Amino acid sequence: MKKYIIALDQGTTSSRAIIFDHEQNILEISQKEFTQIYPSKGWVEHNPLEIWSSQYGVLQEVMAKANITQENIAAIGITNQRETTIVWDKNTGEPVYNAIVWQCRRTADIVEGLKRDKEFSDYVKENTGLILDAYFSATKIKWILDNVEGAREKAEKGELLFGTVDTWLVWKLTNGKVHVTDYTNASRTMLYNIKELKWDERILRKLNIPRSMLPEVKNSSEVYGYTNLGGKGGIRVPIAGMAGDQQCALFGQTCFEEGSVKNTYGTGCFLLMNTGENIIQSKNGLVTTIAIGLEGKVQYALEGSVFVGGAVIQWIRDELKLVSDAADTEYFAKKVNDNGGVYVVPAFTGLGAPYWDMYARGAIFGLTRGANKNHIIRAALEAIAYQSRDLIDAMKEDSGCEITRIKVDGGASRNNLLMQFQADITGTEVVRPIITETTALGAAYLAGLAVGFWKSKEEIAEKWSVSEVYTPNLDEDEKIRLYNGWKRAVERVQGWEE
């Protein structure tokens, strides 16, 4: 009897493997951090071989910890950091360059050049749902082809392959037999036409990217191929679900209905609203993306991305050394009644939605002689909630929907002070599920549905359960005063870097 699904969760700072049973309980988790490479100011890279070795290592480790063999595994689902770009040699399987990470800003100049062509810029937004930005994969691929010796010649001969991290992992798991992605990951490349559901020839021509490099685009839930976890002669396990991390979280939160909203507090913050079959073009700095692709049909989503969410807590711990453990931030923040007039704007890599300012930089405002470390810690936590409020306001305006309830997940969602402040500053109910590993759970759902482990979305939704509900409890005048202070602080940091 195949009792389990394994979700591979390949994130920005670590690779994880999580085993779920049929009742959606977590049997075991393994995690391994890997190296962050910063070769130049604003550049961020990963070693693709280390992404693979760390991910495969935790897969083997989690099975050993749980004492299960491949005979017990119904399927594997994959979820991944999105936009991160890997180009490798089709014949040798060797990457031609490090993975260029979604946070990397090296292609800002390429983007500025493209933006000068207003018609092209509008075309990109209209057809990919995205705005021209260094965040997405397209200009990263172009950079590799233009800057790695011999890469363009090889690409034009059909010898190089491109993939986001999901594609790379499937390629490696199937020993180079399968080169695929899913609708959600394709929609983050800035090369995929989300209306026609195909790679966009006009954008490929403009960026001089050969079509032969690109993977085949599949549903988010289907059997893509098989991997043999037991070596030669072992049982082949289907790889059966795949979606970008934020779309997996939306699915894992059972946001199946139009108008449902989730916010993930990871390295960044990512607010997504399921818009069903409607492509809503944002006028407020959000992007339109594919929420999920099932049985050849897609649902769309509005998305707002904050570059630095939970990462501000790591900064408080690692750089400022104000705490030794990220979990201690709540304890210290509670030692003061309010932020003491202090605001932290964590624009370390620029500002994401709704501002999209690559040249903004971080700052602390409102310091007085009475400000202490607890005020700064509290202000850093509050910054996560303020940035999420920015996204919620933009989403309300774009969608015309009143948002009364947000499902939350990710590491920082375990911080009760932050979640209560999130409810207070937005005036919305904040709901945290029992399982906050919703990204991995979404990947497990997708894989499980493909192989009949779970029969339907309805069966999945019945088992989803709530741990905590935070209701707004802040005076309206105070809410306005606090948020106005945030908006003043954000104005000050914009355009800082020349």
UniProtKB/Swiss-Prot annotation:
Homotetramer and homodimer (in equilibrium). Glycerol binds at R82, E83, Y135, D245, Q246. Belongs to the FGGY kinase family. Its EC number is 2.7.1.30. GO terms for biological process: glycerol catabolic process; glycerol metabolic process; glycerol-3-phosphate metabolic process. The keyword Ribonucleoprotein does not apply. This is Glycerol kinase. It catalyses: glycerol + ATP = sn-glycerol 3-phosphate + ADP + H(+). ATP binds at T12, T13, S14, T267, G310, Q314, G411. Key enzyme in the regulation of glycerol uptake and metabolism. Catalyzes the phosphorylation of glycerol to yield sn-glycerol 3-phosphate. It comes from Clostridium acetobutylicum (strain ATCC 824 / DSM 792 / JCM 1419 / IAM 19013 / LMG 5710 / NBRC 13948 / NRRL B-527 / VKM B-1787 / 2291 / W). Keywords: ATP-binding, Glycerol metabolism, Kinase, Nucleotide-binding, Transferase. Signal peptide: none annotated. Pfam families: FGGY_C, FGGY_N. GO terms for molecular function: ATP binding; glycerol kinase activity. GO terms for cellular component: cytosol. The keyword ATP-binding applies.
